[in-house]
From Swiss-Prot:
Main location as per UniProt: cytoplasm
Gene giving rise to this polypeptide: dnaA
Pfam families, A to Z: Bac_DnaA (PF00308), Bac_DnaA_C (PF08299), DnaA_N (PF11638)
Region (Domain I, interacts with DnaA modulators), start-end ranges: 1-75
SUPFAM superfamilies, per database record: P-loop containing nucleoside triphosphate hydrolases, TrpR-like
Organism per entry: Clostridium perfringens (strain 13 / Type A)
Protein name as catalogued: Chromosomal replication initiator protein DnaA
Binding locations of ATP: G163, G165, K166, T167
Annotated S-S bridges: none
Length: 457
């Protein structure tokens, strides 16, 4: 943001602050970031579609009025989603890279530009990460790697459920390394983007450029690495990328929703390499950590939230950080839209749909076994037995598949629940049913029916 635009925006904010409540100001107006101003049009960046809709319908006229007071001119206001702007920026960067194709080094290698580092989220730093018992080990491992890249643990493999902070730690590592060494070549990418770039490289006959891009870096961070499983060409390419970086003593950081040994259809040679360094897990946050996360979020966003409301949220939302912070924002939005103070009663109203779903009976391996046994007119003991006749073996595989899909239980634990079977048996069952689901409509219907009954109890 240039100085003139910044000054204009700050003056407008001071006017608006006196016209609406503190909650509304902090929730909606402060979420805007000015992008540019020209031809009597002010362009503002907003975080999501919901916020965009509220600003457009409730606060647009107020923004226009404030700008008129400051500048004596009438401006139009245009709102843009941050995600759209990021995509536009990526496209611009891609075009720049394409223009550089003919100006690469003599050996044809691509120099990783500073723009690659721009893919890191500025909000995801070690300073903004809330440490608790559930993530202390993963945080310590990440900090050790950031302080001594390729010397502490290589690779670092972080795993855990959705929304628990894996991506936050990966970005924090990248930021820390760049802060200590601005010339470091740090690349963060999702496994999906890695795969898509590989596909495009093959299609456009640019394999060498693709390899140079990922093999001539100091730090490679790949998120959701489990998604390369089952993709033979991607696994082949990443295997050689991993080897090239490791041999050159470059740092590799990977994240996944499960440990390497539990990723189905992952090649053994990759699985073993993922286990070369340190494997660190992140568990769902305990109550104290959930409270700390909520207080941190409230402080950062400038929100005045009573302690008893945060206790209520932390008691009701236990699964992950994303849902926890989302619940807080939902309550603040509900307060602003209904023009009521934030209270436990208001929080209960705002979260009633979310909480009612959360408090339904959890799906367990036992409930899955009961449902599958009832469907096939079997006993649970049959599913746990060592019998391998098809009328028992196939329902057992279905129950194992559902256990992997609908519970957070590890593969070895699932195997134990089915008569002490090995985790590889569970992987085989999961892969077989997954494959059959692609063509067997009867199986699809049955799986959907059982899943619906289990999740709506």
């Amino acid at each position: 943001m240039d100085a003139q635009l910044n000054n204009l925006w700050e003056q407008a904010l001071n006017i608006i602050k006196g016209e609406i409540s503190e909650i509304s100001f902090n929730t909606w107006i402060k979420s805007c970031t000015p992008i540019s101003i020209s031809d009597n049009i002010l362009k503002l960046s907003v975080p999501n579609e919901f916020t965009k809709g509220i600003l457009d319908t409730r606060y647009k006229d107020l923004l226009i009025q404030a700008l008129k007071i400051v500048t004596s001119r009438k401006f139009k206001i245009e709102f843009y989603l941050e995600s759209d702007l990021e995509e536009e920026k990526e496209n611009e960067e891609k075009q720049k890279e394409e223009k550089k194709e003919n100006t690469n080094d003599v050996d044809g290698s691509i120099v990783v530009s500073d723009e690659m580092s721009a893919t890191l989220n500025p909000k995801y730093t070690f300073q903004s990460f809330v440490i608790g018992n559930s993530n202390r080990f993963a945080h310590a491992a990440s900090l050790a790697v950031a302080e001594s890249p390729a010397k502490a643990y290589n690779p670092l493999f972080i795993y855990g459920g959705v929304g628990l902070g894996k991506t936050h730690l990966m970005h924090a590592i990248g930021h820390y390394i760049l802060q200590e060494n601005p010339k470091a070549k740090v690349v963060y990418v999702s496994s999906e983007k890695f795969t898509n770039e590989l596909i495009n490289a093959i299609k456009d006959d640019k394999n060498e450029e693709f390899r140079n891009k990922y093999r001539k870096v100091d730090v490679l961070l790949i998120d959701d690495i489990q998604f390369i499983a089952g993709k033979e060409r991607t696994q082949e390419e990443f295997f050689h990328t991993f080897n090239a970086l490791h041999e050159e003593n470059k740092q590799i950081i990977l994240s996944s929703d499960r440990p390497p040994k539990e990723i189905p259809t992952l090649e053994d040679r990759l699985r073993s390499r993922f286990e070369w360094g340190l494997i660190a897990d992140i568990q769902p946050p305990d109550f104290e950590t959930r409270m700390a996360i909520l207080k941190k979020k409230a402080d950062v966003e400038g929100l005045n939230v009573p302690n008893e409301v945060m206790v209520y949220i932390a008691t009701k939302i236990k699964s992950n950080i994303r849902e926890l912070e989302g619940a807080l924002i939902r309550i603040i939005a509900y307060s602003s839209l209904t023009n009521r103070d934030v209270s436990v009663d208001l929080a209960s109203e705002a979260l009633k749909d979310i909480i009612s779903n959360k408090e339904s009976a959890p799906v367990t391996v036992k409930t899955i076994q009961e449902s599958v046994a009832n469907y096939y007119n079997l006993r649970i003991e049959d599913l746990k037995s060592q019998r391998r006749t098809r009328n028992i073996a196939y329902p057992r595989q279905i129950a194992m598949y559902l256990s992997r899909k609908l519970t957070d239980m590890s593969l070895p634990k699932i195997g134990e629940e089915f008569g002490g079977r090995d985790h590889t048996t569970v992987i085989h069952a999961y892969e077989k049913i997954s494959e059959n689901l692609k063509t067997d409509e009867g199986l699809q219907s049955m799986i959907n029916d059982i899943t619906k009954k289990l999740t709506q109890k």
